[in-house]
Amino acid sequence: MALRFEELIERHHDEIFAYLWRLMGNDGRRDAATDVEDLTQDVFLRAYDSFAGLRPNSNHRAWLYKIATHCAFTQFRRMKHRRDKLSLLKRSAVELETASDDSSSRKDMEQRVRALVNGLPAKQKACVTLRYLQDLDYPEIAQILSCSQEGARANVYQAIRHLRLALEEEK
């Protein structure tokens, strides 16, 4: 039985939205959810355009993740000139200085890590997000990002190394 496009949306919309939310980062803007929803719609519009040519035995989930990743990378390129990384770092530093050292320390650490992940190169950010937040294995990541499994592993390794160094520098 062939999968209908509507079924594909029902099965994967929330998962793709969550992936894009994590990949794009929630920078505290009120309209961040709207931006991610718009990007999710773009993913499914692109998927609809090529759905008829998709082989029935294809991995639909990986195919959607690949489209989502490409849409996110396109969005990153569009936003690059608008986003000032220095202001993000300054804002993170101010948040860290004003944070209390009581029970909110775990939440503060999560915010620091989230800010650092958002500052990673796009491919490393995608690999870390797919591996640790979406819980995908390296073959799936490689398929989604059109790279080798070794390339996916290397990007995750480099990202983790970068995050560790940045966290050590903050201490």
Question: For each predicted feature, which ranges?
Answer:
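Internal acidic/polar
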Residues: 82-106, 137-140
